Regions:
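N-terminal capping/small domains of soluble enzymes
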Residues: 1-94
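Gly/Pro- and small hydrophobic-enriched strand-loop and loop-to-helix capping segments
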Residues: 120
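Glycine-rich anion/phosphate-binding loops
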Residues: 74-81, 99-108
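Conserved small/polar residues in nucleotide/adenosyl-binding loops
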Residues: 109-114
């Protein structure tokens, strides 16, 4: 059975993808999930520069669940391109990078850097 889908020019072997921010950058869950079997790994947000995220507390229990406000903590695109993308490629994952930034220029820089590393 062919479950492949094409979304905005990205072909995935199936429609199952991870939620950005809940799956880190993939390596954190690779012990539990074969990343190559997913339709795609959607990474946590990554910016042009490292972001420390919000101060603690970042998580609060509420009736029926929890709330979190991590604040887009990330190592920045340079570390992401050097460390995370090669890991995901080696694992056979289709990669969707969630970019974040404080300006249009930041978003463009981060998107271009991610795009360049994915096309190598």
């Amino acid at each position: 059975m062919n479950l492949s889908v094409d979304i905005a020019g990205v072909t995935m072997k199936n429609p199952v993808t991870t939620g950005s921010g809940t799956f880190g950058s993939g390596e954190e869950f690779s012990e539990f999930v074969d990343l190559s079997k997913l339709g795609a790994v959607t990474t946590k947000g990554v910016a042009n520069v490292p972001w420390p995220g919000n101060p603690v507390p970042r998580v609060a229990e509420v009736y029926g669940g929890m709330l979190n406000a991590i604040g887009l903590q990330n190592p920045g695109i340079d570390v992401f391109v050097e460390r995370d993308i090669p890991y995901l490629k080696k694992a056979g994952a289709t990669i969707i990078v969630n970019v974040c930034g404080k300006s249009e220029n930041c978003l463009l820089y981060t998107s271009d850097a991610a795009d360049d590393s994915l096309r190598v």
